[in-house]
Amino acid sequence: MSNYTEEINRRRTFAIISHPDAGKTTLTEKFLLYGGAINLAGSVKGKATARHAVSDWMEIEKERGISVTSSVLQFEYDGYCINILDTPGHQDFSEDTYRTLMAADSAVMVIDASKGVEAQTRKLFKVCGMRGIPIFTFINKLDRDANDTFDLLDEIEKELGIATCPVNWPIGSGKGFKGVYDREKKCVISYSDTEKGTKEGTATEIPIQDEARLRELIGGEAADKLLEEVELLDGASAEFDLSEVRAGKLTPVCFGSALTNFGVEIFLKHFLNMATAPLPRKADTGLIDPAENEFSAFVFKIQANMNKAHRDRVAFMRICSGKFDAQMEVRHVQGNKVMRLSQPQQIMADERKILSEAYAGDIIGVFDPGIFSIGDTLCMPKDKFQYEGIPTFAPEHFARVRQMDTMKRKQFVKGIQQIAQEGAIQIFQEFNTGMEEIIVGVVGVLQFDVLKYRLENEYNVEIRLENLPYEHIRWIENKDEVDLEKLTGTSDMKKVRDMKGNPLLLFVNAWSVGMTLDRNKGLVLAEFSRS
C-alpha cells in the first residue's frame, strides 16, 4: 500500500451533533485532550476554570458560552488523523449544522442522559438519515442523575427509528456513577480523579468475572445490579453488525461523562475502529473515489474576519479525493478559472498553521478574495465535474434591516453581503428596490443578535431590525414558466428576490401558501433551493 493511500485510509472525518447543552463542545475538548492537541481542557461554562473552550473562538461565543460557528479541529490519535467538525449546538443554528454535515463521513450524536432524545436531536438525526451516514451515540452526563439506561435505548429506537447496540454500559449515575462496563473486553473500567475533567486521569480495569475485586471496587449493590443488567443486555440487545452501522441502520452506543472524562477515551477508540475512512462522493459525472482520483474538493463554509486585524475571509473546503499540494493549480469549476489556492491552512479555533499538503478527508481553509460560494467544486485543471450542491433551507424568521448612519452605506452593504455569503443569514430584496431595503431571513432568532453584533464590531455599522410577521418562504421552482407580474396570492404575500436573482414568495402562514397554489395552477413552490 502506498504512503498516499495509507494517509487517506487513516483519516476519520466526523461531525458532532446534539441538542443545546448536551455536552457536545465539552466532548470535543476531551477528544483534543486525549489526542494531545491541548494540555488542559477548558470548561465551556467557565465554572471549574476560567479557560474558554478551544472550539469557541468568536467573541460572541466566549461571552455566551455557546458555539455559533462551526469550528474545524484536527489532531492525531493512535495512528489516526482525526478531523472534527464541531457544529453549533444552539437550536438556532441548524442550517449551518446541515452544511457541516455535508462535509462529514459520519456523525457522533451526543445525548443528555437525564433528558433523552430532544427536538434538535431529532432534526439533526433526520439530516444524517438523508445522507445515510453512520451515527455513533454518546450518552453523556452520567455524573448527574440519569434516566433508566434501558429506557434511554428504547427511546432512541422509537423516536429516531434506528436500532441500538450498547458498546459499554454505565455503572450507576450521579453521585453513584462508578464507571463503565466494556462489553467487548468484558471488564469494568473505573477512573481516578481527573481534576474536574481537566486532566486525562488513569483507568483501573477489572474483569467482570473477578467478583471479589469488582465488589471491592464498586460496592456489592452496584455489582449485583451490573451483573443482572449485563445478563439481560446480552439476551435482549441487537447483535453488533458493522455493515449495518456503516449503512446508518444501527447506532453503537457508549455511555460516560465528558465533563469528568468517564468513558470518553473508550468511546473514541471504539468509534475509530468502526468509522470509515473517506468514502466515494457523488458528482455529476458519477462517484469520485478518494484514492483513485486526483485532487478534488468542495466549499462547505465561508467565514469572514477570522482575524479582525486583517479583515480576511476564509473558505473551508472538504477534500474529497487525492492529495492537495500547496503549489498545485486547481480548477474552480463554477468560476471556470484555473488558480493556485492562496494561503492554504489548517485552522484550530483562531490558531492557524500553513499547510504544504493535505489528503482526502481533510478540511483546509484558503484565503478567499470573494470568488467562492458555499457548494463550489474544485478539481484538477484537466477535470470538470461538480459535486452535488448544498441546499439552501428556508429561513423561519424575517426582519427588515436599516442602517442608522446612511454615510456608512458602503460598509453596511459589504458587511451584510459577506455575512450572507457565509450562510449565517439569507438576504432578500423586494421587487424594484435596492440594497437600502433589505429583508434578512434566519433559521433561528439568535442569528439576528449575531448579525447586529458582527456589523457593529467588525464593520463599525449600527443597524435597526424591524421584525416582520412572515414565517414561510418558498422558492418558485418553475420560475421560467411563471409570469411573476400576473402571479396572485393572498393580501399578506410578498414577492422578493434572493441575491442570485431567484424569485421567492413570503407568507405569514401555511394557509396563505396553500391559497396561492390554488389560485395559480401549475405553480411549483419549494422549501429549499439548490441553485
Annotate each predicted stretch with a short phrase:
Residues 1-531:
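Structural and coupling elements of P-loop NTPases
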